[in-house]
Amino acid sequence: MLSHLADLQDYFGPLRLLRYITVRTLLAAVTSLTIGFVIAPWLIAKFRELKLGHGYIDDRTGALGATYFDKKNTPTMGGLIIFLSVFTSAALWAAPNIWVFVSLFVYAALTIPGWRDDYLKVVHKNRNGISSWEKIGWQSLATVVALGLLLWHPASAQKIREFWVPFVKYPLIPHMHWAVLLVLIYLWIVGFSNAINLTDGLDGLAIGCTIPVALVFGIMAYVADHVFLSQYLLTSHVPGTGELAVICGALIGGCMAFLWYNCHPAEVFMGDTGSLALGGLIGVMAFMIHQPLTLVIVGGVFVAEMLSVVVQVGVFKITKRRSGVGRRFFLMAPVHHHFQKKGWPETKVVLRFWVLSLGCALAGLATLKLR
């Protein structure tokens, strides 16, 4: 929106800087950071006043339950802090185009079921929240509408059909059938939506791991939009996706503001309101800039968390079917709880996972040069 102020540069010269994506990305980060710091104390106080916190300790934590006693009644729905910060900042500083619109649509659409899930848990004391089918329904609807918009708009109709993989300097699939495209984009949006949701189990863990992912994809979005850089690095050129770097800037600022209040001991939890939407936003952006498999590398911590649950459930079912007694591969899943069971303090688990996330992000960024 504010990018159009650059048209007034004849009246005020410095406004010409708004033509540069890098400048608006920085402004988006500062804006979302500021909004987050302004609204977070008020929202946290309001959540406490309304008693919008989990009033129970999850039985699945077992012996870890005592560790979480101090977190009982900590306000949740903190994802609203991130959403208001990121969405407002991105809407202000990103130049409107189909890529921006679809990204913000997916982000908003997946915030709704997350908020509803948290609402049922903290207001109606429904420990299960929304049903799995309702959650899948929302995620499916968001995916179908997003893909429909991308296939309808002339600026994205052809580009979105290309499928690129790391280390290869041409599209592996130049023109995907819409049905194949639907399956793939669904897997990325829903997969990473649920992956971040599973990772959000310790103070600051999920949000801290999201920041390096957003930083790397901001760089990749800028490269994809830049004619010279995309040609030099032999990556896909997707005109207009540079504006996604502005969204990533807003995401970094919003996450940093939230982390200030979510670090141990957390004053607020993001809840499903934040985690489901963040995963969907990152997933759809990765797909639109033709870096879906790179996300598997960059978001390695999230992938590991999700796979740990899949392995745990799979091993338990297989061993129970064969011997009648289910066995577990990990002491507890997701894997961050496994390390807690081994005696690691919560802060050590979180900090080490942050280090791993940064390493994964740098490894994914390095793939730009390897073709």
UniProtKB/Swiss-Prot annotation:
Belongs to the glycosyltransferase 4 family. MraY subfamily. The lineage of its organism: Bacteria, Pseudomonadati, Verrucomicrobiota, Opitutia, Opitutales. GO terms for cellular component: plasma membrane. The gene is mraY. Pathway: Cell wall biogenesis; peptidoglycan biosynthesis. Its EC number is 2.7.8.13. The chain crosses the membrane at residues 25-45, 77-94, 136-156, 172-192, 204-224, 240-260, 269-289, 296-316, 348-368. It catalyses: UDP-N-acetyl-alpha-D-muramoyl-L-alanyl-gamma-D-glutamyl-meso-2,6-diaminopimeloyl-D-alanyl-D-alanine + di-trans,octa-cis-undecaprenyl phosphate = di-trans,octa-cis-undecaprenyl diphospho-N-acetyl-alpha-D-muramoyl-L-alanyl-D-glutamyl-meso-2,6-diaminopimeloyl-D-alanyl-D-alanine + UMP. GO terms for molecular function: metal ion binding; phospho-N-acetylmuramoyl-pentapeptide-transferase activity; UDP-N-acetylmuramoyl-L-alanyl-D-glutamyl-meso-2,6-diaminopimelyl-D-alanyl-D-alanine:undecaprenyl-phosphate transferase activity. This is Phospho-N-acetylmuramoyl-pentapeptide-transferase.
